[in-house]
Design a protein with these regions (language model features):
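Conserved beta-strand-loop-alpha-helix hinge of the TIR/SEFIR fold
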Residues: 74-91, 95
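Glycine-rich beta-alpha junction loops
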Residues: 25-27, 143, 155-161, 213-219, ...
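Catalytic core of DAGKc-family lipid kinases
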Residues: 22, 44-45, 55, 93-98, ...
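Short glycine/serine/threonine-rich phosphate/pyrophosphate-binding segments
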Residues: 61, 83-88, 109, 136
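Short N-terminal binding/cap micro-motifs at the start of the first secondary-structure element
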Residues: 28-32, 136, 221
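Internal anion-binding site segments
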Residues: 192, 199-202, 208-245
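ATP/NTP phosphate-donor binding region
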Residues: 2-76, 126
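Glycine-rich beta-strand-to-loop/alpha-helix junction loops that act as flexible
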Residues: 25, 79-81, 102-105, 216
Length: 245
């Protein structure tokens, strides 16, 4: 019997791409409205219904991101502040799954440095669904031998860390990023600490500092450029020591 060549012209099981949205529920006032918008936007952009995964106090995002990867989604969006972004990035680092950022937090440092929409869920989601991919750097840190964690923007010790840790959620909800300034005032009189920094195996001279920062990017809220030389894709971190005088 003579066989005829077969040419495949289509596939019946092709599916629309799927986005998972790992969101911090404390950053949304009306969960019903934004979830409705998420479904509508995905439909308009040719995507399937989104997979919505809420973070919790016990799991601020890593478990939800692993579930999204397990379900083989095409994109994972972090919807929240820099904390949610960091948790999602920790899991996605080194994978082939791209990450989108919907900046709904207080500082939104990474979103600002990538020139992404801030405090606009609809625009942020559309940008993520339509946007081009870009590779950025991540920093990794461990404390006292604990498991490494990634940071996407800036990590600090001393004055900076005290300020971040002691800014209340209520203050951030009411005043936005200005709440960090209010919290910082109580630590301005701290005498600082003595630190020795080692960079690429070279030990720098010990110095007294109020805060030491490692920066993957340099743009802060209100357009403040803390570290003008910092670039998010230059394969290096910029260090900054703030002296107590």
């Amino acid at each position: 019997m003579r066989q005829r060549p077969c040419r495949i012209v289509g596939c019946m099981n092709e599916r629309a791409p799927v986005v998972a949205i790992v969101y911090n529920p404390t950053k949304f006032n009306d969960s019903t409205q934004w979830k409705k918008s998420a479904h509508q936007i995905c439909q308009q952009e040719g995507w399937a219904d989104p997979l919505l995964l809420a973070t919790t106090r016990d799991d601020p995002g890593q478990g939800m991101t692993r579930e999204a990867v397990r379900q083989d989604v095409d994109l994972v969006c972090a919807a929240g502040g820099d904390g949610t972004v960091r948790q999602v990035a920790t899991v996605l680092a080194g994978t082939r799954t791209p990450m989108g950022i919907i900046g709904m937090g207080t500082g939104n440092i990474l979103a600002r440095n990538l020139d992404l929409p801030i405090d606009d869920f609809d625009k942020g989601l559309r940008t993520a669904l339509r946007g081009r991919r870009r590779t950025i750097d991540l920093g990794w840190v461990s404390f006292d031998g604990a498991t490494e964690q990634c940071f996407t923007a800036i990590i600090g010790m001393g004055f900076d860390a005290d300020t971040m840790a002691n800014t209340s959620e209520a203050g951030k909800a009411e005043y936005g990023w200005i709440a960090y300034i209010v919290a910082a005032l109580r630590y301005l009189v701290q005498p600082g600490f003595r630190a020795t920094v080692t960079i690429d195996g070279k030990v720098c001279e010990a110095q007294r500092a109020r805060s030491i920062l490692l920066c993957n990017c340099g743009l802060l809220p209100a357009g403040i450029r803390l570290v003008p030389s910092a670039r998010i894709d230059d394969a290096r971190l910029d260090s900054l020591a703030l002296a107590p005088h």
